[in-house]
Amino acid sequence: SYPTVYLHPNAHASYYPGALPLTMKLLFDDSGRILGAQAIGIDGVDKRIDVIATVLRLKGTVADLTELELAYAPPYSSAKDPVNMIGFAAENILAGLTDVFTYEQLPSFDRSQSILLDVRTEAEFANGHLPGALNIPVDDLRQRLGELNKDKLILAYCQVGLRGYIASRILAQHGFRVKNMTGGYKTASVQLPNKPAAPCGIEIDTETQTVREVKAEQKKNYRSLNACGLSCPGPLMKVKTTLDDMDEEEILEITAADPGFSD
């Protein structure tokens, strides 16, 4: 088996309208030589694969990905392109800064000798988590190290991998054996058993309105929230903060750029 890293960057700068997420996967060997890559998304997929394929053809390494100078403007990319970012993530593994595992490898660990640790916020954990996980938000981790057993392997994860990496560094510096799940819960969630779909159709008669008619109404119990351009856990936390401030029967409309936000 070869080292694998998953990443979920935006196709271009998140503060620029229309930023949509990519999902990227990179395979490489212990010397850093690139063995393959995959990417899916709505925008900017082809150029990332073209770049990595070119580096692969020239027998390049993950270190080469980190040094590439690629076209940059907010509508097209970020100052650090997703290709650079997946190179950084792979380089961290090769440098020994972090040890990773994939969701597919999770069943291979002895759960009696390990702790599955979710380092996301309490709101994110309540919204969905891996079975058997213990929730300690990364911001509270230093104060709650006493809740963890140093004799057990810590299997940390967050939403996409960044906070899991930070948690793994904190834990390693305090003498814990720890691995971070690359790609985080976002990668794992698509492999979890599917939730049953809502029934189709409406069983009762209802009045219909056009969008123009709805917008024309002055609804005192109506709030609009723009969660576009926020990185995790920003959108979910912003929704929770708004909901905590709302009264019963108020309606909340949420606008988000991430197609998977509804999950």
For each of these PLM feature ranges, what is it?
Residues 10-16, 38-46, 73-75:
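Glycine-rich phosphate/pyrophosphate-binding beta-alpha loops
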Residues 24, 30, 34-38, 45:
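Contiguous mid-protein beta-loop-alpha structural module that forms a pocket-lining wall or clamp
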Residues 43-62:
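A short, polar/charged loop-to-alpha-helix boundary motif
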Residues 1-31:
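Structured beta-strand/loop patches that form or line metal/cofactor-binding pockets in enzymes
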Residues 33, 149-153, 245-252:
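Short, surface-exposed connector motifs at secondary-structure boundaries
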Residues 63-104, 110-115, 122-155, 159-220:
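Rhodanese-like catalytic fold shared by cysteine-dependent sulfurtransferases
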